[in-house]
Amino acid sequence: MSFKKNKYVVIKKAVSKEVINFLKDYFILKRRVAWTLFDQNHINQFSQDYGRFGDGQVPNTYAHYGDVAAEVLLSKLKPLMEKKTKLKLVETYTYMRAYKNGDVLKKHRDRKSCEVSCTLNVGGDLWPIFADGKKIILKPGDILIYKGCEIEHWREPFLGEVCIQIFLHYNEDKPNAQIYDNRIHLGLPDYTKNN
């Protein structure tokens, strides 16, 4: 399967089992920490520094923009992404979600900072993603690379308990690239963007 021809490609076992297990445990604990901090009013409900519970796409579900561990992964996987896409890329941002039972990801295309997008299955119950009308099942460690701004993608209602995904986003290295999603560097929250 060719990324250039099909606008998406699946890489099986792109991330080692050891790294996947670390990321899964890390994000499960991070979600718990965020819940405790919000629930006990240690941080206000509008803080995004520990992630948030809900966004415009998936309400009431834990998500985090620009997590430092995920953004290190974004940089470390860039050579593999360049090899598979045959494009010179720059990192833009990461986003993590811990989907729960009943969640739906509506059919959409991504924004400008997501020219080359990847979804990495970190763990939990399997949940197919549809890309350009094709049903794709990713196991932990598998990555789907796709042209996020061009390919419609979605997920039907989730029937499992939890499914953790990390989204890794890149732009082609060209003058109008959204380097670091308009932040000074990786790892910063989205409110630091220079828009």
What annotation goes with each model-predicted range?
Residues 1-85:
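Non-heme Fe(II)/2-oxoglutarate
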Residues 4-5, 90, 162:
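A short, polar/charged loop/turn motif at coil->beta-strand junctions and beta-hairpin connectors
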